[in-house]
């Protein structure tokens, strides 16, 4: 069953620094639920091709049902999967850790041990790229339940996002 709770709201406040400053960060999507399935180890699925534009947004809220390895790629250019990207891995390494890195497949810049994914049920997540930090959290209420935070020097503008997976994954975006 797909839950309409993932309908995207227009704006949210996201805390983006340790000083507690606020930015109004637009959330990707227009309220329509987009279901996607990514078979294991296939090519990236650009979200723009399925109707989700992130170019004027700073937050992505989604749900994933997977045994392990849900990958989200934040990109400067929708056609470039290698340069000026951030790869967020949720439930990687057989669902033992999640992390953020500046290139596909390289060493994590920041990671945590967790069992974020579930083979039978959807779990909700959010990703924020407000300011010069990338945040990742559980649930659908950023900035609550943050699990990852990483500050990048000279962060490129995020204009696109793509998804893929290490195991058969169902997404609700």
Curated annotation (Swiss-Prot):
Free-text tissue specificity from the UniProt record: Component of the acid-insoluble organic matrix of calcified shell layers (at protein level).
Membrane-spanning parts: none
InterPro entries, sorted: Methyltransf_FA
Leader peptide range in chain numbering: 1-20
Keyword Glycoprotein among UniProt keywords: yes
One Gene Ontology cellular component: extracellular region
Keywords per UniProt: Glycoprotein, Secreted, Signal
Domain of life: Eukaryota
Glycosylation, residue list: 53
Subcellular location field: Secreted
Name of protein: Uncharacterized protein 5
Source organism of this protein record: Haliotis asinina
Lineage: Eukaryota, Metazoa, Spiralia, Lophotrochozoa, Mollusca
């Amino acid at each position: 069953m797909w839950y309409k709770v993932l309908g995207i709201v227009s704006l949210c406040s996201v805390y983006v620094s340790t000083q507690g400053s606020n930015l109004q960060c637009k959330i990707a999507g227009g309220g329509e639920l987009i279901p996607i399935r990514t078979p294991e180890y296939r090519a990236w699925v650009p979200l723009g091709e399925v109707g989700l534009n992130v170019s004027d947004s700073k937050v992505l809220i989604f749900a994933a049902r997977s045994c392990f390895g849900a990958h989200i790629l934040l990109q400067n250019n929708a056609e470039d999967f290698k340069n000026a990207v951030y790869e967020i891995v949720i439930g990687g390494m057989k669902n033992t850790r999640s992390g953020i890195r500046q290139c596909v497949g390289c060493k994590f810049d920041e990671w945590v041990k967790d069992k974020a994914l579930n083979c039978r049920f959807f779990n909700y997540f959010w990703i924020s790229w407000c300011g010069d930090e990338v945040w990742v959290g559980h649930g659908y209420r950023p900035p609550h339940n943050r699990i990852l935070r990483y500050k990048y020097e000279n962060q490129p503008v995020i204009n696109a996002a793509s998804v893929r997976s290490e195991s058969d994954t169902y997404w609700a975006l």
